[in-house]
Amino acid sequence: MKIKMLMAFVALLLFSAFTADHTITIFMIGDSTMANKSLEGGNQERGWGHVLGGYFSENIRVENHARNGRSSKSFIDEGLWEVVINKVKPGDYVFIQFGHNDEKVDEKRHTDPGSTFDANLRRFVKETRAKGGIPVLFNAIVR
């Protein structure tokens, strides 16, 4: 029930910003809980972003840039954020969901709540807004 309500809210949000001359793109950035997964070998694991595009018409495109094992820090450090932000156009959405891997102890992924984690989220929001995009923050979901 919660997922249906979330999808209805997202659809309403997107349709309220729709203009006929612009295909809206939803850019997704996050970790494995959002990421697309290989379907080979009967793999049944899916991130929620894997199926999101199926809820929209051809006027709304979903680009899922979420990757397994990424934290907000590693997403930036690996250049994945730069790829996304360079594509954002006015009216596009950036769905942001990190947290699980930010708590890892290794220095390539670790961020501190109230400090580096918050700064990374603020960066995503600020840079998205600067391009005319609409940032949407999601809490980390249960794995």
Tell what function each PLM region has.
Residues 29-33, 64-70, 96-101, 138-142:
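Active-site-proximal beta-strand/loop segments in catalytic clefts of secreted hydrolases
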